[in-house]
């Protein structure tokens, strides 16, 4: 029933007038058949939503009931979420009104009892969420009709047992969530209702389970996943659990934080008769892993042992884990005191049994060092993380990784280990290594290049955040395959040596030299790095290099980087930019010049940045944003950052910029608050985007008079030159036109037989293309014959006469339009004009335009007095860029050649 609030209004104190103010549902948002009515303090179900909605969200409201009648209009619902309300009872008729309902979420309500009728009509449900209610006991069989149910969530209730019914049911159930209840024992008679079920996940975490009765798991048809996290099992109950799991279908077993402090060769004995593939023993404070503890788990593939306290890993502790591919030992070996004697130990050959191991995580441990046979036997290891793992790994020698000599290691993480020195041949055993991370250490040395010997397949070396690195010409000579080199904040020295330390890195795509206070760079430092795509040089001191006052002039250290996509030059103190500094950077997409001292930029500095998408110039000293400087850069921009610049709000400085930002779709963060005028004084602090540009229109009489006089003078000069150089041609065309109009010559093209299918008008420079493609079309279609000047003009005939005759003998005229054609004097002055004139005089639609290049209409009109709108669409063709579309182009051309010449 709709709840209403009576609102009584009095007028004059005499005439009462009552009104009913209904609760509003207009705040619900509806999109793509999904209605969101959450967080609206609703006390009843809205009745004005579209009838075709399939998803309805009513969470976080004040609903106490769900009257079935209120859902009559929403019969298409497949998902209903009424969580976080105060519903205490569910009407059985609800699902009768919602026959298509598949997902019902009732979490965080006040349901306490479920009768046999509660879900009797919810036969299509696949998910039922009842977590965080007050259900303490399941009586009879409330879920017996849910034959399609896949997920049932009863977690965070007060259930004291797993009994959910008295007869076999829920045959399609895959996930049963019973965590955070008061279950103390698992009994077969309570679980036998799942005799026909295949449970992929049985979630019993955070219960007080003390007993596993015999056959409790065998009562379930098939059990694949069991989760008992945060259950105080201990070693004894864990052993009993595993015995009960024997001969089941268990695949995944999670025992995180189950107080399993020790393991022995009998702990997991029961799992010998299973095919367990995943075992989670994390957060157990496990300190003793006995020999052969996991010998019964030959099928295990994923093993989680992180956050334990293993004091000694024996040579046979991991025996039997022959198929493990992933092993997580993060923070599993931690010392108990500051005493060196308390450091955890890992025996040699401890990992030799893990023949299939590919991923090993040993981060955040207190291991004394790497022994000569620590990793021996890991013949399939590809990823090894040793970040913050060692207490005394100060120097990497040629013996450090000898135990990995037979491992096909691809990724090695050695960060946060306080490494101070890398000796020659330190990685010579790691020939397959692709990624080497040495960041966040204390390395301080000269890199001779011998450190990387043997890294024949290296792809990335990360050396950022170390003490200092001094480069030499051979620092990277032995790693030509390197594509990513990170040298951020390493107090880089000798970077300006010649030849450049980076010269051998021809395959480099990412180079990070930021935060190094670099002041000197040679113009050949990046020479040869033609594949470089990302260059980070922020937070250095490169200002002098681009000054015109620099001895020898500006240093163009970016030359040749034709494939560079991202350039970061933030915080370098630049106050000048040479006009050609970005000349070669045609593919540049992101430029960051923020936090510098730039004021005036050269007019054409961004002319070649046609691909630019993001430009950052924040916190500079820019006062003027003019079109001649920023126009090319802003053309395809998607993001612009020019915050905190002292803009000069005058017509000359920002009028164009204001018009642009008010019209563009480019993302400009904080436009209203951080783009403020600095000068003149009366505009100080005024938002730039609100600057009135209407006053910038020039209406000075003198300038207007000057423009008019200049225009008249230029027109007069043009006419004089035209008559002087082209007078005879004008006279000739005038006479021809007069003769045509007066009827000196009659032409009836309807009965005339043409010798050529088309006459080709093209620029001289395009003759090779014309010959290649039109002659090949003639060979493919014998009925086609084009008039090609080089082949078909009669010898000895005057060229102009031959052109006129050939056009008359051709049924169509094809213009091959390129920039060369627009500049070809013969084509512009005679061929094109004569062809168009003949088509107009004969009332024919005989011209076909073939565009080999993208030519704007205004250029076409300016050069040839033609526009695309003068021709039918099928007579305008564009040469395709893709070779596979050439056949389609030729087909369209043949259609155009076969079309009627008549305009009507």
Swiss-Prot record:
There is a cross-link at residues 765, 812, 831 (Glycyl lysine isopeptide (Lys-Gly) (interchain with G-Cter in ubiquitin)). Gene3D superfamilies: Ribonuclease Inhibitor (3.80.10.10), Toll/interleukin-1 receptor homology (TIR) domain (3.40.50.10140). The modification Phosphotyrosine is found at residues 759, 858. Monomer and homodimer; dimerization is triggered by ligand-binding, the signaling unit is composed of one ds-RNA of around 40 bp and two TLR3 molecules, and lateral clustering of signaling units along the length of the ds-RNA ligand is required for TLR3 signal transduction. Interacts (via transmembrane domain) with UNC93B1; the interaction is required for transport from the ER to the endosomes. Interacts with SRC; upon binding of double-stranded RNA. Interacts with TICAM1 (via the TIR domain) in response to poly(I:C) and this interaction is enhanced in the presence of WDFY1. It is found in: Endoplasmic reticulum membrane; Endosome membrane; Early endosome. Changing residue 812 to R: Loss of ubiquitination by ZNRF1. It comes from the Eukaryota. Changing residue 134 to P: No effect on IFNL1 induction. Residues 726-904 are cytoplasmic. The keyword Membrane applies. Disulfide bonds join 28-37, 95-122, 649-677, 651-696. Heavily N-glycosylated, except on that part of the surface of the ectodomain that is involved in ligand binding. TLR3 signaling requires a proteolytic cleavage mediated by cathepsins CTSB and CTSH, the cleavage occurs between amino acids 252 and 346. The cleaved form of TLR3 is the predominant form found in endosomes. The gene is TLR3. Residues 24-51 form the LRRNT domain. Key component of innate and adaptive immunity. TLRs (Toll-like receptors) control host immune response against pathogens through recognition of molecular patterns specific to microorganisms. TLR3 is a nucleotide-sensing TLR which is activated by double-stranded RNA, a sign of viral infection. Acts via the adapter TRIF/TICAM1, leading to NF-kappa-B activation, IRF3 nuclear translocation, cytokine secretion and the inflammatory response. It is linked to Immunodeficiency 83, susceptibility to viral infections: An immunologic disorder characterized by increased susceptibility to severe viral infections, including herpes simplex virus (HSV), varicella zoster virus (VZV), influenza A virus (IAV), hantavirus, and possibly respiratory syncytial virus (RSV). IMD83 clinical manifestations include acute infection-induced encephalitis and pneumonitis. This is Toll-like receptor 3. Belongs to the Toll-like receptor family.
């Amino acid at each position: 029933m709709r709840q209403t609030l009576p609102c009584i209004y009095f007028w004059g104190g005499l005439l009462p007038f009552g009104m009913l103010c209904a609760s509003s549902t207009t705040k619900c948002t509806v999109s793509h058949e999904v209605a969101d009515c959450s967080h609206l303090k609703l006390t009843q179900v809205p009745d004005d939503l579209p009838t075709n909605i399939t998803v309805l969200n009513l969470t976080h409201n004040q609903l106490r009931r769900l009257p079935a009648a209120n859902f009559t209009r929403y019969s298409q619902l497949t998902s209903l979420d009424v969580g976080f309300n105060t519903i205490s009872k569910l009407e059985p008729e609800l699902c009768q009104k919602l026959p298509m309902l598949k997902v019902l979420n009732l979490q965080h309500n006040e349901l306490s009892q479920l009768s046999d009728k509660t879900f009797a009509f919810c036969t299509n449900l696949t998910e039922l969420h009842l977590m965080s209610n007050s259900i303490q006991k399941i009586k009879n069989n409330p879920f017996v009709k849910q034959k399609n149910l896949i997920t049932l969530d009863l977690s965070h209730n007060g259930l004291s047992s797993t009994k959910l019914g008295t007869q076999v049911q829920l045959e399609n159930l895959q996930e049963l969530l019973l965590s955070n209840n008061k279950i103390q024992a698992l009994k077969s008679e309570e679980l036998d209702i799942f005799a026909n079920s295949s449970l992929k996940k049985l979630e019993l975490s955070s219960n007080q389970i003390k007993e596993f009765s015999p056959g409790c798991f065998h009562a379930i048809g098939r059990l694949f996943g069991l989760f008992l996290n945060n259950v105080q099992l201990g070693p004894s109950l864990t052993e009993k659990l595993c015995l009960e799991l024997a001969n089941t279908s268990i695949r995944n077993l999670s025992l995180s934080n189950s107080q399993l402090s020790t393991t022995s060769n009998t702990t997991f004995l029961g799992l010998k008769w299973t095919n367990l593939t995943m075992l989670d023993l994390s957060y157990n404070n496990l300190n003793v892993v006995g020999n052969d503890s996991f010998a019964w788990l030959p099928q295990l593939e994923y093993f989680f042992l992180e956050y334990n306290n293993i004091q000694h890993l024996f040579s046979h502790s991991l025996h039997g884990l022959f198929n493990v591919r992933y092993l997580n030992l993060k923070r599993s070996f931690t010392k108990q005191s500051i005493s060196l004697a308390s450091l955890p130990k890992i025996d040699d050959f401890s990992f030799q049994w893990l023949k299939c191991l590919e991923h090993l995580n040993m981060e955040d441990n207190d291991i004394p060092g790497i022994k000569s046979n620590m990793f021996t036997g890991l013949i399939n290891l590809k990823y090894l993380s040793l970040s913050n793992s060692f207490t005394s790994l100060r120097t990497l020698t040629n013996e450090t990784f000898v135990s990995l000599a037979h491992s096909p290691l691809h990724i090695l993480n050695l960060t946060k280990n306080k490494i101070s020195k890398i000796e020659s041949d330190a990685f010579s055993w790691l020939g397959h290594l692709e990624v080497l991370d040495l960041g966040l250490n204390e390395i301080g040395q000269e890199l001779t290049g011998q450190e990387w010997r043997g890294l024949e397949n290296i792809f990335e070396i990360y050396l950022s955040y170390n003490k200092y690195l001094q480069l030499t010409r051979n620092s990277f000579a032995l790693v030509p395959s390197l594509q990513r080199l990170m040298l951020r904040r390493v107090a880089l020295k000798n970077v300006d040596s010649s030849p450049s330390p980076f010269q051998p890195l021809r395959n480099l795509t990412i180079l990070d030299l930021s935060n190094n206070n670099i002041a000197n760079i040679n113009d050949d430092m990046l020479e040869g790095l033609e594949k470089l795509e990302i260059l980070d040089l922020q937070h250095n001191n490169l200002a002098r290099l681009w000054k015109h006052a620099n001895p020898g002039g500006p240093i163009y250290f970016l030359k040749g980087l034709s494939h560079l996509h991202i350039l970061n030059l933030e915080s370098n103190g630049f106050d000048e930019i040479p006009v050609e500094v970005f000349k070669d950077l045609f593919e540049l997409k992101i430029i960051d010049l923020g936090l510098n001292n730039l004021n005036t930029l050269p007019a054409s500095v961004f002319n070649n940045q046609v691909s630019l998408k993001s430009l950052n110039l924040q916190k500079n000293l820019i006062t003027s944003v003019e079109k001649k400087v920023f126009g090319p850069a802003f053309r395809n921009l998607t993001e612009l950052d020019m915050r905190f610049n002292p803009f000069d709000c005058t017509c000359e400085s920002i009028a164009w910029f204001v018009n642009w930002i008010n019209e563009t779709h480019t993302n400009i963060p904080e436009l209203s608050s951080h783009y403020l005028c600095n000068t003149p004084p009366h505009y100080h602090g005024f938002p730039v985007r609100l600057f009135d540009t209407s006053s910038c229109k020039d209406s000075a009489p003198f300038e207007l008079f000057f423009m008019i006089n200049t225009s008249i003078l230029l027109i007069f000069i043009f006419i004089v030159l035209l008559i002087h150089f082209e007078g005879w041609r004008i006279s000739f065309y005038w006479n021809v036109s007069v003769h045509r109009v007066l009827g000196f010559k009659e032409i009836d093209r309807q009965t005339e037989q043409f010798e050529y299918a088309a006459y080709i008008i093209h620029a001289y420079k395009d003759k090779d293309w014309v010959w290649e493609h039109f002659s090949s079309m003639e060979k493919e279609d014998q009925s086609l014959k084009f008039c090609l000047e080089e082949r078909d003009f009669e010898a000895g005939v005057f060229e102009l006469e031959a052109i006129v005759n050939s056009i008359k003998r051709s049924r169509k005229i094809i213009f091959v339009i390129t920039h060369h054609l627009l500049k070809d004097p013969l084509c512009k002055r005679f061929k094109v004009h004569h062809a168009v004139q003949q088509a107009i005089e004969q009332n024919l639609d005989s011209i076909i335009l073939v565009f080999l290049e993208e030519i704007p209409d205004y250029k076409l009109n300016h050069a040839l007095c033609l526009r695309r709108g003068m021709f039918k669409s099928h007579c305008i063709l564009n040469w395709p860029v893709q070779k596979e579309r050439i056949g389609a182009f030729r087909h369209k051309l043949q259609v155009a050649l076969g079309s009627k010449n008549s305009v009507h």
